[in-house]
């Protein structure tokens, strides 16, 4: 065991806490933020991977940047507020890890994406590369489609410094009157509401398409915005603001009003990052740095002046040979009945486990709520809503149900970051038709994915439930891989009824004998399940833990896993994102293996298996639910995890976990040195997601 001094650990949602690690804990601990950068490196690796279709590679460059934006808004914002030497050192270390990734991203775009797209007839050009005819065409496009949306500004004593919104890109110029040496700054915001890639047709060979970035077209026509003035070279700058605004709930003020005030305040939060394109004017850099009270560590000089999130626009060009083969989610065989109301009798005949996006979200979860809204036997519908999107069929179904006189209750999480305004809107729409809308439990976010339908049947009232690992969001249901359970088993439905009483009323704690509910029982129950595996191993009984989740960070859970490993319990962890546990450390985690699976779908499901003394995995315990093993999930959120009680559904989960553990195409393995290595199989080796697609096709044939 190392004799190192206790270390500071980056833990939790709201800052770098002075949590002291013991020497043993420090030996197996990986910093959360460093591990997150490793995760985003794995995303970038998909763009660098020759096996990935070309437009998908462009999409992964965009995902890499989008992820990084959120990382800065949430995590780097916290670190920048830190005052200790350790926190400042971590900022420097994170920056040093990030800079080579940014160079890799730029090299991939410039040396791979652009020339390879050209080979396939997609020409990406800069303004200076255009022919005179193309520049004239772009100028006409600018006059008709861009200029009316622009607001050219100057900064001088008569014009105050303009507001720069979060994640906005701006072009900054030196502006002079002809014959004068004095200059002022001019600023033009690049609008996000317009197409970010301008298509041109002049001098383009037949069968090819040519695009120019929007900011290049603006830059090439900027003189029209400042007619009669002299413009210097443009500096492209992109700004990121702090989004980690922690609201302390005021019991004397309504939560809705507090959230609305928080949304307004977020626009004006401190700037935490400035990104500059190549050749940025040094005076502009220094002016902005001083204006926003930043240090040199907060400025990033990028190798390429492109905002890579704009590549999402190109990634969906209709060129099938450059994209993943289209996947249309299939109707689960158990739900292959054209009568919408038949879903309730189908659930009565047995629990159903659906796996999205392989199996249809519309034909299962949406259908469940839609049928309940239209069914005259439905008495009530209750749902949690964390992220539900813009054009949500779920709210439409709830509105229709309320208009039909059914009792409708929705626990709307209006503190879901970046979805607050959307959720406030849907809350108002539901209240308008008389639905009961509550905002959950004071001080907690409601993150569980649960729906309850109560019907009047011959024998009395019967409850039906959906519990999932993913949001009630039709868009992400096509992009995220998640599980959901449909059941009318009273062992589960009774708990869900009590859970909603807790969420909508003032019960101190729901009576839940089957479900694991955070922050009330989940942490304790999970620790008990791990302890049981330790006891079984010591008693000579079969013991094993397989846990799949998005991230692992909670210190209690990591400590319990270390104790299980030390007792000889084999542990397999499938963790897509950051993992704060280092496997394979002698005396601590030598029986723990960690892998991460990255692919076309975001692996979002949380699945837990405990052998429970049984040699046959199908006789062990299985759970699915909404919670990762993070401090915030187990202590600061309402989360729901359900056991899977039916043998056939356990088999489906075990088959999936087994596929994940055997994957040598999409998997990365975490070593005892804290670094990930990508497995490299034969070229025709299938990964987890393609294997599940094939199995899903077989199941309906």
Which residues does each PLM region occupy?
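N-terminal localization/anchoring segments of enzymes in phospholipid and broader phosphate metabolism
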Residues: 1-545, 563-567, 579-601, 605-701
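Cofactor-pocket helix-loop regions in the catalytic cores of large enzyme subunits
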Residues: 550
């Amino acid at each position: 065991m190392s004799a190192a001094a206790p270390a500071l650990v980056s833990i939790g949602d709201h800052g770098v806490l002075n949590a002291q690690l013991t020497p043993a804990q420090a030996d197996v601990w990986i910093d959360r933020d460093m591990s997150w950068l490793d995760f985003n490196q794995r995303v970038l690796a998909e763009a660098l991977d020759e096996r990935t279709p070309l437009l998908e590679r462009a999409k992964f460059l965009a995902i890499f940047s989008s992820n990084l934006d959120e990382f800065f808004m949430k995590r780097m914002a916290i670190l920048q507020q830190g005052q200790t030497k350790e926190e400042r050192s971590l900022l420097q270390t994170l920056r040093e890890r990030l800079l080579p990734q940014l160079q890799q991203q730029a090299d991939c775009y410039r040396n791979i994406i652009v020339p390879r797209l050209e080979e396939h007839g997609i020409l990406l050009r800069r303004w200076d590369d255009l022919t005179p005819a193309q520049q004239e065409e772009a100028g006409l496009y600018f006059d008709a489609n861009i200029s009316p949306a622009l607001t050219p500004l100057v900064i001088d004593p008569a014009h105050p410094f303009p507001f720069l919104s979060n994640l906005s890109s701006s072009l900054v110029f030196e502006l002079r009157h002809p014959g004068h040496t004095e200059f002022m700054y001019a600023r033009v915001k690049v609008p996000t509401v317009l197409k970010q890639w301008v298509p041109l047709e002049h001098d383009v060979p037949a069968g090819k398409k040519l695009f120019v970035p929007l900011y290049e077209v603006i830059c090439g026509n900027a003189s029209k915005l400042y007619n009669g003035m002299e413009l210097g070279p443009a500096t492209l700058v992109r700004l990121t603001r702090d989004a980690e605004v922690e609201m302390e709930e005021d019991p004397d003020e309504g939560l809705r009003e507090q959230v609305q005030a928080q949304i307004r305040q977020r626009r004006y939060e401190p700037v935490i990052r400035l990104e500059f394109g190549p050749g940025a004017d040094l005076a502009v850099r220094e002016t902005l740095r001083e204006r926003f009270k930043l240090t040199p560590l907060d400025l990033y000089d990028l190798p390429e002046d492109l905002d890579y999130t704009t590549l999402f626009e190109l990634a969906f060009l209709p060129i099938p040979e450059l994209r993943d083969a289209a996947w249309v989610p299939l109707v689960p065989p158990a739900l292959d009945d054209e009568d919408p109301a038949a879903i309730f009798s189908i659930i009565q005949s047995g629990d159903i486990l659906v796996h999205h996006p392989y199996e249809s979200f519309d034909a299962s979860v949406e259908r469940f709520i839609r049928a309940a809204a239209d069914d005259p036997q439905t008495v009530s519908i209750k749902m949690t809503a964390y992220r539900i999107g813009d054009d949500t069929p779920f709210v439409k179904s709830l509105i229709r149900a309320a208009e039909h006189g059914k009792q409708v209750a929705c626990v709307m999480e209006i503190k879901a970051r970046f979805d607050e305004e959307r959720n406030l809107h849907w809350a108002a729409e539901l209240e308008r038709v008389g639905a009961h809308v509550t905002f959950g439990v004071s001080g907690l976010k409601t993150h569980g994915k649960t729906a309850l339908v109560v019907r009047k049947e011959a024998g009395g009232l019967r409850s039906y439930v959906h519990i999932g690992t993913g949001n009630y969001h039709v868009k992400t249901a096509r992009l995220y891989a998640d599980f959901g359970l449909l059941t009318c088993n009273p062992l589960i439905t009774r708990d869900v009824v009590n859970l909603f009483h807790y969420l909508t009323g003032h019960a101190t704690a729901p009576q839940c004998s089957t479900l694991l509910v955070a922050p009330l029982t989940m942490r304790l129950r999970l620790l008990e399940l791990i302890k049981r595996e330790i006891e079984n191993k010591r008693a000579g009984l079969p013991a094993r833990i397989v846990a799949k989740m998005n991230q692992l960070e909670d210190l209690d859970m990591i400590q319990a896993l270390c104790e299980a490993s030390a007792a000889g319990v084999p542990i397999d962890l499938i963790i897509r994102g950051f993992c704060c546990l280092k496997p394979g450390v002698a005396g601590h985690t030598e029986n723990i293996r960690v892998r991460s699976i990255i692919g076309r779908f975001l692996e979002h499901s949380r699945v837990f298996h405990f052998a429970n003394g049984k040699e046959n995995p199908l006789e062990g315990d299985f759970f699915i639910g909404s919670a990762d093993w993070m401090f915030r999930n187990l202590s600061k959120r309402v989360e729901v995890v359900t056991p899977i009680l039916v043998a056939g559904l356990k088999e489906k989960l075990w088959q999936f976990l087994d596929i994940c553990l055997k994957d040598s195409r999409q998997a990365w393995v975490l070593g005892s040195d804290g670094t990930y290595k990508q497995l490299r199989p034969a070229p025709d080796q299938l990964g987890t997601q393609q294997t599940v697609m094939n199995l899903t096709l077989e199941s309906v044939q």
